[in-house]
A protein has these predicted regions:
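Acidic-aromatic/histidine active-site loop/patch
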Residues: 1-35, 87, 94, 170-173, ...
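P-loop/Walker-type NTP enzyme "switch/lid" segment
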Residues: 6-16, 27-49, 66-140, 148
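Short, highly selective alpha-helical patches that border small-molecule cofactor pockets
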Residues: 47-51, 55, 176-180
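Short, charged low-complexity intrinsically disordered segments located at boundaries
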Residues: 53-55, 120-123, 164
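Post-Walker A helix-loop "phosphate-sensing" segment adjacent to the P-loop in P-loop NTPases
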Residues: 56-68
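A generic structural signal for alpha->beta connector loops
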Residues: 62-64, 110, 187-191
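Conserved catalytic-core segment of NTP-binding enzymes
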Residues: 124-211
Length: 211
């Protein structure tokens, strides 16, 4: 799977090696032809919000960015302050809302967000394919947040301008190894690992930390 991140870009190869921060990853993106990042969570916790953190970092760096949430959960909507009941991919697929109405703005940043309202759609569905194609034309970078339990759907999201990022906390290195092992068993060996900056506990957000 070709990923055009430069050879000198920060990368986190094997278990036990250093993990990049969102800032380092943004620097690498500036020097590459990568236009899409598929985000997988290494721990099911903070890693599930890795796409939000990275999207904010990309937007702060002056690049246009959109986050497509295919996790089927509510974490990303809650973190970005998008109102419950806002239209998403389901409404778009059912012709209940045009593309422009399912694109929301992160309440704490300039990154745009598309939600998978209701059940998470299949990444290879015609509607997701159409949205991804439109976003590739309109944004510098598209982030696709995907449930790590749906790795079998990865091939439909990958091309020569796509990279896979495994996000999580430094305190849970085994999570990186587990997800990486599963990906490599599928023949995916070119991975980037990202350490999330903040820790959230008991539903309360910790103060922002520089990434």
């Amino acid at each position: 799977m070709p990923h055009d991140i430069p050879a000198d870009a920060p990368a986190a190869p094997r278990h036990g090696d250093e993990v990049v921060t969102s800032r380092e990853l943004v620097m690498a993106l500036h020097r590459s032809a990568i236009g899409r990042l598929v985000m997988l969570s290494a721990d099911g916790g903070e890693g599930g919000l890795g796409g939000v953190e990275l999207g904010r970092a990309i937007a702060r760096a002056g690049m246009s960015c959109i986050l497509i949430d295919l996790t089927g959960e509510e974490r990303i909507a809650a973190e970005t302050g998008i109102a419950p009941g806002s239209p998403g991919l389901h409404e778009f697929a059912e012709n209940l809302a045009p593309l422009g109405e399912i694109i929301h703005r992160d309440s704490r940043g300039a990154c745009h967000v598309v939600l998978a309202t209701g059940a998470a759609p299949q990444p290879d569905s015609p509607d997701v394919t159409l949205v991804l194609a439109a976003c590739a034309e309109a944004y510098d970078c598209t982030i696709v947040a995907l449930d790590a339990r749906r790795m079998d759907s990865l091939p439909s999201l990958l091309d020569e301008e796509t990279a896979i990022v495994v996000a999580g906390q430094a305190a849970t290195p085994d999570g990186y190894a587990t997800v990486a092992g599963e990906l490599r068993s599928l023949g995916v060996d070119d991975l980037i690992f990202m350490q999330c900056a903040a820790t959230r506990r008991a539903g309360r957000r910790a103060p922002d930390q520089p990434d």
